């Protein structure tokens, strides 16, 4: 097998979104090949080498920022000058990415407690709404409506998120939602360790999520796969939505194409630690 540049490997396997990002990670000393640290982007490695990105020196407080980074690269969405909401904030990777890209305020909502990074807790632009179930959030709980939002939640379906987003968002709001097959598919379709591998189930879940969006005045205007897999190796999807009066479905056959591309790219890709 012919060898490949390390920075190129990281891009091709969905660990980063650009060669520039790959080079930065490699030079920072957190990329390991077969358990050995490699700090040269041009290092030639075997395609079947064990490659790991260790630590959190990825430009954001958590890898969630990489998901929103990709969404902003492939969809026409920007948080510049907008009031935003990070639904399922956890450590705050999405919040961090929003702030780095010009958000004027971010409501960081999470049912958990004590997870948000200290740098974000102490940022005047961040409204820390921890211990808050998004299903209970009402327009009167916010100082103003939300124009840009992200959703990255676990153990809850998007079915319960879109009605809230419909109520709290501006008429022209945009958002990106992580569609996670492991939390949307029926229990009988979820495999060992909560992993859903069947492309047919992925297509079914995305079609259902599309319906949830449209039923709550959101047009699913774009679809791609997350650049990194979930903790147990689940492939997850980025659905770009636009708030509107007359929702339209995704272009025909887009779901099938994106699911196929996601498996081609990520089935054998290492996880980002």
Please state what every model-predicted region is.
Residues 235-273:
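Flexible, glycine-/basic-rich loop-and-beta segments that form/coincide
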Residues 92-93, 114:
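Glycine-rich SAM-binding Motif I of class I
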Residues 181-198:
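Short, glycine-/aromatic-enriched active-site segment of Class I SAM-dependent methyltransferases
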Residues 80-90:
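Conserved class I S-adenosyl-L-methionine
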Residues 159-176:
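A short glycine-rich, Lys/Arg-flanked "PGG" loop and its adjoining helix->strand segment in the class I
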Residues 97-105:
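Conserved S-adenosyl-L-methionine
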Residues 1-49, 83-84:
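A basic, amphipathic helix-loop patch mediating RNA/tRNA/ribosome contacts
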Residues 107-160:
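S-adenosyl-L-methionine
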């Amino acid at each position: 097998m012919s060898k490949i540049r390390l920075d190129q490997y990281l891009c091709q396997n969905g660990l980063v979104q650009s060669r520039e990002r790959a080079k930065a990670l490699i030079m920072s000393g957190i990329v390991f090949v077969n358990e050995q640290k490699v700090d040269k982007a041009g290092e030639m490695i075997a395609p079947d080498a064990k490659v790991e990105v260790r630590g959190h020196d990825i430009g954001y407080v958590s890898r969630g920022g990489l998901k929103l980074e990709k969404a902003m690269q492939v969809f026409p969405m920007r948080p510049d000058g907008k009031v935003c909401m990070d639904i399922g904030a956890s450590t705050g990777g999405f919040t961090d990415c929003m702030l780095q890209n010009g958000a004027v305020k971010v409501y960081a909502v999470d049912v958990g407690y004590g997870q948000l990074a200290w740098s974000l807790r102490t940022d005047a632009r961040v409204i820390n709404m921890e211990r808050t179930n998004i299903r209970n959030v009402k327009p009167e709980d916010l100082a103003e409506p939300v124009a840009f939002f992200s959703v990255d939640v676990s153990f809850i379906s998007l079915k319960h998120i879109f009605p809230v987003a419909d109520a709290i968002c501006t008429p022209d709001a945009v958002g990106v939602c992580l569609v996670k097959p492991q939390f949307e598919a029926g229990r009988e379709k979820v495999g060992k360790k909560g992993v859903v591998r069947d492309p047919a189930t992925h297509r079914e879940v995305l079609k259902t999520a599309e319906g949830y969006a449209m039923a709550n005045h959101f047009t699913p205007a774009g679809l791609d796969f997350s650049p990194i897999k979930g903790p147990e190796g689940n492939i997850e999807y980025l659905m770009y939505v636009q708030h509107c009066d007359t929702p339209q479905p995704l272009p025909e056959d887009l779901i099938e194409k994106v699911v196929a591309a996601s498996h081609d790219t990520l089935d054998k890709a290492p996880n980002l630690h």
